[in-house]
Structures are given as C-alpha cells and as structure tokens.
C-alpha cells in the first residue's frame, strides 16, 4: 500500500429517465448535496423508494425538493449512505491527459500526471488518493504520452491496493493502443473512454467516475455520487464559481433553480463569454464575491450512469472526442438530466507552468496553505521510498517545505519547496523556488569521478543564488550560478542551454547541467 460554501436554496427534482430510475413513493423532500470547505446542505427526511423501469422521461411527476443550508464543515457532516457502497458500485477512470505542451519542459520526459508535486508526491497521487479515501477501490488510469515514469510510480505506490468489496480493489494503467477496429490513438477524453468501454462495461457497477490526472484538490467523491443518485441524474458535473480572467479556459454552464444544467459552453470567448454570466448568489456566494466570480465552471469531473455512458459514446455520439465540448452539451440537448454538483473548496487545474508553480508554492502559505498535505482524515498517498530524514547543517530555513532524504548545508532557504534527495551546498540562497530533487544519490566515488572529469554533481553548488525558478530532477547546478532573471524576461526557449522561461519563471530541464558562474 502507498505511504502516506455554498449557502443557498436550490430545488431538486425527483425524476426518471429512459433507463431504470428510483422514484420516491411519497411527496417528501430530498436534497441536493453541496461540497464546501465551510458549509454543506442539511439532509432532510429520506423516503422509501420503489423501482420503476423504462418510464418515459417527461411522463413522471416531479416532486421538487429544497436544500436547507447548514453551517457545518465537511469533516463534521461527512456521513454518506450509498447503497450499494462505492467500492462495489463505482468504477474510477482517471484520464492521463494529452502531451502536456503547456507544462513543457516538465513533460519532456514524463506524462503530465507524473510531474512531481509538493516535495514528495506526484500529480496522479491526488485523484488516486481521493478515490481511496472515498471508498472507491476499482481504478483505471488511462495514459498515452511519456508514460514510463507514471506506470512505474503507480505500480510501486498502489500495487498492493486490494481493498474494497471482497478485496477486489486495483489501480491499473491502460495505455493507448491501436486495433483493427480503431487504428488511432486517443483523440480526446471521450475517445479515450470509448476505446476501453469493452473493458469498463464488464464491471458490475452503477456509475463511472471520470477524473482528470492533473488537478490539485481534495474531494469526498461519495458525496458527489450520492448527489448524483439523489437527484436521479444521468450525468453529474462538478462545478465551481469562476472569475472572468480564468473563465475562458474552462467549460461554463448555466443552471436552473433545480441545479440542472440548461446551457453549456466549452471555453467561450467574446460575446459568448458574456452570455454565460450568471448570478452566482444562487450558489450561496455573497454579493461581493458573486460580482468577482460571475461564472459557473466545470471542473472536468463527472459521474455518469453506466448505461448512459454506453449509450452516449456508442450510439448517440460515436464520433465525439471530448466530454466538455461535445458529450456534455450533446447530452443536455438530448434532454438527459445533467446536474451540477456545486463545489467551493480549493481546486487548481495545473495546466501551465505558472499554475504549477503557484500551486506548489501555495503549500508554504501562512497561516493556512492553499492545499494541505497534513489532513489526517483524508491523507494523500504516494510511493514508499524508505528514505532517511532530511539533514540540515547550519541552514537558515523559513516558510518552506522540505522533502525526505535531503542534505542541506549552511545555506538560506526561504518560501520554497525542496524535493526529496535534494543536495544544497554551502552559501547557496534559494528563494521562491520549487526544487524537485533527485531520483538517486550519488556516491562519494561518483563525485570524485565527476570532479576528475570537470563535471558537476547533482544538486545546487556553492554560493549559487536561485529565485523564482523551478529546478527539475537530477539537475546539476554549478558553483556561483545565478538564476534570478535580472532582466525580467517573460518568455524564452533555451533548451540547448538547459532551461526555459515561461511567465517569468525560469525552469531548468530534468538532467540539465548549468556550468559554474552562469547567470540566467
């Protein structure tokens, strides 16, 4: 096994579909679940249920229900009552993503979900840990680009995951493949799932939980799934309020007073963006925050009923490649019940160098970090490495996170994240920097041989100064190197010299060598 907000009143219908539906036998009320760092909906009296099969949509009588907000935290009100429970009835599908061009050069030698995070972890650990903490033990990870390190990490971190119902849990990697029926690689998120539907449909589950492998957040998926079932949804989309600056990068939606999605636009711009503005006070935001965040954005996380997924990808939209731009809007147009699940906790789409940098440095924030790895109720798991404790000799370290197995000598480190096995020499200054560390230690014999060749050992050399930078794994930074971007260059590609600059952040490539005395 691996080591280790909303206030509002929404009406929620009890509906049916062309598939088997659960209908209340009385007019008592149900609730739409909220997920928030501070507030959740109060659950009202449950009702006895009966099963009605093949009832045509539109012929049923819908009984609206009211959310009654209650000021309690998720940790205080974490009870769910899934029947059957998630370990038996839900299959997790994590999408490994595309080539990760916006994260280049961090994705030069690895898949996007394999990019190191928070000193000890990798991005893929976030959705996998969320699944395991939510009692979802059957998990597939779909990969395509540079997947060797991702496959290695998953096999080492989660190979012994045999939890769940009858100890049938697993975390398995599914690589893109060609076949006589489909000679193409994955063309998008929906196409990736479609190509493995033959495998997914063999599992006796009720829902597919579709997740992205490059998001940073903590979510109880059991509440998400419970909301899907209680609202009798065909598809449920996790959503959150969004400001105008970032809205163009996401799918945006409009919802009615029942929480049902009535309009969906993928990454709109110009007039189309303006048309997607809504009054987000319906999500429970106060007037001031609603003005700052006038959009409802999709998180790219979906719960889809199994029979609905099979029908949509095979019959309704056999040529659709993407969930956000094709399948979700298409399902809405078909009249399927597509619900929004409102989430107001911390969430970051780590799709760019700047977003990745800010997310990592955010864990050093005082007094409360943007994202905490210290939540014992929902830990983040990763590969057990059995490294020794980090050793700091006369070092001055402030507002920083230090990973396992580091050797830090007589240097200054401020507001930085230092990855595992990092070696930092005397006199170095590290500020506002993400240092990813190393995959291995070099022996004294290795260092002697490198010195004889005039080369540089892995780590940060003497008297070097690094500020606002990302130093990828196994980088060799010589003595008296200055990576401080004194000219405030915003964009530069110097791959032959071992680095890129994006959004003013210097990124040193994995395995790069920066000679002594270099100034960047």
From Swiss-Prot:
Leaves. The keyword Metal-binding does not apply. Residues 1-81 are annotated as: Disordered. One of its GO terms (molecular function) is ATP binding. It holds the Pfam family LbH_GLGC. GO terms for biological process: glycogen biosynthetic process; starch biosynthetic process. It is found in: Plastid, Chloroplast. Residues 1-71 form a transit peptide. Keywords: Allosteric enzyme, ATP-binding, Chloroplast, Nucleotide-binding, Nucleotidyltransferase, Plastid, Starch biosynthesis, Transferase, Transit peptide. It catalyses: alpha-D-glucose 1-phosphate + ATP + H(+) = ADP-alpha-D-glucose + diphosphate. It is an enzyme of class 2 (transferase). NCBIfam families: glgC (TIGR02091), PRK02862.1 (NF002772). This protein plays a role in synthesis of starch. It catalyzes the synthesis of the activated glycosyl donor, ADP-glucose from Glc-1-P and ATP. This is Glucose-1-phosphate adenylyltransferase small subunit, chloroplastic. It comes from Brassica napus (Rape).
């Amino acid at each position: 096994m691996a080591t280790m907000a909303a206030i509002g009143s929404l009406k929620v219908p009890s509906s049916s579909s062309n598939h088997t539906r659960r209908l209340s036998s009385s007019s008592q009320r149900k609730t739409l679940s909220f997920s928030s760092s501070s507030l959740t909906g109060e659950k009202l009296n449950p009702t006895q249920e009966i099963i009605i099969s093949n009832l045509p949509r539109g012929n049923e009588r819908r009984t609206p229900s009211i959310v009654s907000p209650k000021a309690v935290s998720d940790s205080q009100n974490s009870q769910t009552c899934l029947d059957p429970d998630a370990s038996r009835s839900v299959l997790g599908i994590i999408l490994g993503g595309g080539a990760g061009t916006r994260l280049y050069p961090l994705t030069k030698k690895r898949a996007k979900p394999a990019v190191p995070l928070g000193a000890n972890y990798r991005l893929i650990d976030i959705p996998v840990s969320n699944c395991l903490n939510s009692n979802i033990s059957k998990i597939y990870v779909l990969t395509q680009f540079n997947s060797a390190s991702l496959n290695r990490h998953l096999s080492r971190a989660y190979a012994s995951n045999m939890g769940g119902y009858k100890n049938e849990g697993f975390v398995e990697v599914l690589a893109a493949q060609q076949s006589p029926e489909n000679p193409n690689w994955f063309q998008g998120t929906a196409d990736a799932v479609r190509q493995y539907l033959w495998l997914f449909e063999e599992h006796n589950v009720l829902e597919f939980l579709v997740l992205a492998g490059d998001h940073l957040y903590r979510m109880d998926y059991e509440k998400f799934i419970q909301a899907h079932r209680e609202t009798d949804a065909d598809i449920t989309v996790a959503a959150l309020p969004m400001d105008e600056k970032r809205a163009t990068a996401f799918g945006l939606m409009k919802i009615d007073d029942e929480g049902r999605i009535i309009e969906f636009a993928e990454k709109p711009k110009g007039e189309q963006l303006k048309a997607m503005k809504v009054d987000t006070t319906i999500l429970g935001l106060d007037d001031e925050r609603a003005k700052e965040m006038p959009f409802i954005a999709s998180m790219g996380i979906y719960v889809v009923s199994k029979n609905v997924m099979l029908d949509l990808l095979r019959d309704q939209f056999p040529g659709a490649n993407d969930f956000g731009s094709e399948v979700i809007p298409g399902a809405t147009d078909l009249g399927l019940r597509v619900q929004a699940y409102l989430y107001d906790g911390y969430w970051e789409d780590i799709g760019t160098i700047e977003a990745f940098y800010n997310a990592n440095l955010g864990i050093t924030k005082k007094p409360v970090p943007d994202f905490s790895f210290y939540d014992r109720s929902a830990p983040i798991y990763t590969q057990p490495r059995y490294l020794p404790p980090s050793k700091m000799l006369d070092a001055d370290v402030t507002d920083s996170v230090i990973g396992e197995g580091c050797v830090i000598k007589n240097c200054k480190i401020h507001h930085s994240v230092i990855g595992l096995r990092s070696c930092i020499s005397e006199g170095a200054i590290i500020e506002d920097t993400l240092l990813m560390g190393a995959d291995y230690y070099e022996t004294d014999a290795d260092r002697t041989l490198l010195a004889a060749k005039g080369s540089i050992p892995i780590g940060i050399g003497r008297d070097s100064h690094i500020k606002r930078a990302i130093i990828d794994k196994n980088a060799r930074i010589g003595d008296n190197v200055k990576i401080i971007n004194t000219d405030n260059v915003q964009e530069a590609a110097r791959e032959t010299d071992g680095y890129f600059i994006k959004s003013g952040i210097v990124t040193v490539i994995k395995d790069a060598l920066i000679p002594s005395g270099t100034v960047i």
